[in-house]
Amino acid sequence: MSTLKVIEVYTQNGLRKVRPYYNRRSAFVKGRWLGKLLIDVLVSEFKLRPRAYYLDQIRKGTYRLIRDGVPLVPDHLMTTIIKNHDVLETTTHKHEPPVKQWCSQEVEAEDLPGRIAGFNIIFENESILVIDKPSGIPVHPTGQFYQNTITELLKLHGVDALPCYRLDKITSGLLILAKNSQSAGEIQKSIRSRDMIKIYLARVKGRFPHSELILDNESAAETTFEDTSKVTVEMTPIYSIDPKRQFPVGLSASKDAITKFYPIRYFSHADETVVACKPITGRTHQIRIHLARLGHPIVNDSVYCSHITKYPERLKFITQFPRWEDQQDLDAEELKVRFQKFVDETKNNCRTMKTFCPECHTVDLRDPVLSDLELWLHAWKYEEINGKFKFKTDLPKWAQLDNS
């Protein structure tokens, strides 16, 4: 359960910001905590802070134990062991990162037919809501994001819905949300069984294979994948690198992956191609990595485009070793050395400031650069192969003929 939220939203420099707020959460204690002191539990479960920090927070009431509906006083907590049915109550000062503002506050506040919270509605009935997600905002609460997420914004407008699949924060496009668990389960089952045809659009570097064969007109986008001679298939495995986790856990196993690509239009002035992407499997960053390995990365991809990447060591590894387990020269020690390079370059990109919140002493983060909150990758079409539904969005501006 969560209480104490008083949310103040404002916009600044193209960003939607939430002022820091207090949030109180409560939950029953875990079985492994029984018979232990609260201070010992906090130190062992949350190792980022020293013991002295948690002692101070207990005295301030940040952490409380509720027993039989009555909170125990701080001094009592220092000597009382945790019992079954106790409730741990935690009060935190939340600092949410800003997101890209997709519309004015006035438009966000006023819902109209075909629009909710400033998001364009593609389709809606009693079971599902389909919207055109803007880039730069997470779909659901994750990490530091909570209020600045699509599902929480929809709740403020009277719609409690579950996302049926994942779209990254910086990816735009078609998002299907279910209004009940049964509808969510049915759609997710279709995706898992590959009964769902998904087509994305990406704007990539260079002249993509077979793009010389396409007709440069608006109708070209409507005939994707019809001519098999224009299809490029990438089948290299996909794995993830998570520098926030230690090696070897932060380097996942390689998994088979398939993506089909089809050129839609070529912008000769920019030497860039708009490509339709059909992922057959659903690995994390699959389309972005496959395009990078083909030598045609997404134009503004700050991770996988070599021209602008902030993570050159990670990109070099992923493109050089499609299946890292097959490389005999990559023993455990060499992998550990390389992984440390991934960690170092991630730390170098951390946008921290030298100011601290006076209330909770959290280090302030710099505002993100607006261009870092947009990726020219767009979920364009979703179609259930048995004909239950077929949805698509308008073309994003960067894919339109007059946006060369």
Question: Where are the model-predicted features located?
Answer:
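RNA pseudouridine synthases
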Residues: 1-404
